């Protein structure tokens, strides 16, 4: 039975590979020496963000709904994916300012945002309570 299950799993993975399916890339967010995975969105802007890593930023509260940080230079967005849901924990780029915004609560879609990826609940809580501590993103 185990051999059949293993064989089926391998064949399923090979089928995805042959069909050209891609697995979502994961990057790391580090706060106070603890690492939290972030699943990147599957779009060109998320890949461009990942290409700039490692990157260390300081986040601040922007109202009560998001934490924002300002990378230098600002992130340019070329291929915005429009009309996506923004559940809490979504990491985005705000096009007009080129800053990163992580949403602490569910938020309505906004054409000025492009999706970068999704933090885990544990990662979101770490960022929410990070104050002005450095936050490092890496491959």
What are these regions (language model features)?
Residues 88-90:
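Loop/turn positions that initiate beta-strands
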Residues 19-21:
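N-terminal signal peptide c-region/cleavage motif recognized by signal peptidases
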Residues 9-17:
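Bacterial N-terminal signal peptides
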Residues 1-10:
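Bacterial N-terminal signal peptides that target proteins for export
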Residues 95-122:
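Beta-strand-rich cores of mature extracytoplasmic or soluble domains
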Residues 25-70, 74-77:
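N-terminal secretory signal peptides
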Residues 28, 116-139:
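Well-ordered alpha/beta subsegment
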Residues 81-84:
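Short, surface-exposed secondary-structure edge patches
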């Amino acid at each position: 039975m185990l051999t059949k299950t293993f064989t089926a799993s391998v064949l399923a993975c090979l089928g995805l590979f042959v069909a050209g399916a891609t697995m979502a890339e994961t990057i790391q967010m580090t706060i106070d020496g603890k690492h939290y995975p972030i699943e990147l969105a599957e779009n060109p802007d998320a890949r461009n963000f990942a290409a700039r890593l490692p990157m260390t930023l300081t986040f601040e509260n922007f109202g009560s709904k998001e934490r924002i940080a300002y990378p230098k230079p600002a992130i340019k967005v070329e291929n915005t994916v429009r009309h996506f849901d923004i559940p809490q924990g979504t990491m985005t780029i705000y096009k007009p300012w080129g800053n990163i915004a992580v949403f602490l609560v569910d938020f309505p879609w906004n054409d000025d945002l492009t999706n970068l990826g999704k933090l885990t609940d544990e990662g979101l809580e770490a960022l929410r309570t990070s104050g002005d501590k450095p936050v490092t993103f890496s491959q």
